[in-house]
Amino acid sequence: MLHLTIVAVGRVREKYLVAGIEEYLKRLRPYARVRILEAPEEKVPDKPSPAGVEQILASEGRGIGRLIPPSSFTVALDREGVMLSSEELAGRLADLALAGKNEVALIIGGTLGLATFILQQADLRLSFSRFTFPHQLMRLILLEQLYRAFKIQRGETYHR
């Protein structure tokens, strides 16, 4: 069974997102062990300077780095990453399990994204879209896609 660790910046406060996240965590239980770890979120001023942006990204990146399980296959969610279909994601997860890589960390950045050093350390940079999504919403989208991937792997009804 895969162990999935979602490392995300900040907390989710919106009740509708919390409810959706809890629902997909429950749905994923038969397929994988999933936990969400939260790195501290830095306050972002309205118009941060380039140096301020780098400082915030570095600080959040250090927090993320402390939470990534050692020897895990790391996936950084990045708008500039590779785009996969749901079927391709299902295949990648199956391939990881077959290769004995049972520990997977999926990293969601904060408001400004991810520090360069986190992106460089990732085994895979994955994009869900060229659009920018709120990082809190991305947790729900990621969990739904993981659930869909496991349903596809098993040939169970859900994916259309």
Swiss-Prot record:
Gene that this polypeptide is encoded by: rlmH
Binding sites annotated in the UniProt record for S-adenosyl-L-methionine: 77, 109
GO molecular function: rRNA (pseudouridine-N3-)-methyltransferase activity
Organism domain of life: Bacteria
Role played: Specifically methylates the pseudouridine at position 1915 (m3Psi1915) in 23S rRNA.
Gene3D superfamilies: 3.40.1280.10
Database matches in Pfam families: SPOUT_MTase
Record text on subunit structure and interactions: Homodimer.
This protein's UniProt keywords: Cytoplasm, Methyltransferase, rRNA processing, S-adenosyl-L-methionine, Transferase
Gene Ontology CC annotations of this record: cytoplasm
Protein name: Ribosomal RNA large subunit methyltransferase H
Main location (coarse class): cytoplasm
Catalyzed reaction equations: pseudouridine(1915) in 23S rRNA + S-adenosyl-L-methionine = N(3)-methylpseudouridine(1915) in 23S rRNA + S-adenosyl-L-homocysteine + H(+)
Catalytic activity, EC: 2.1.1.177
Entry's localization field: Cytoplasm
Family: Belongs to the RNA methyltransferase RlmH family.
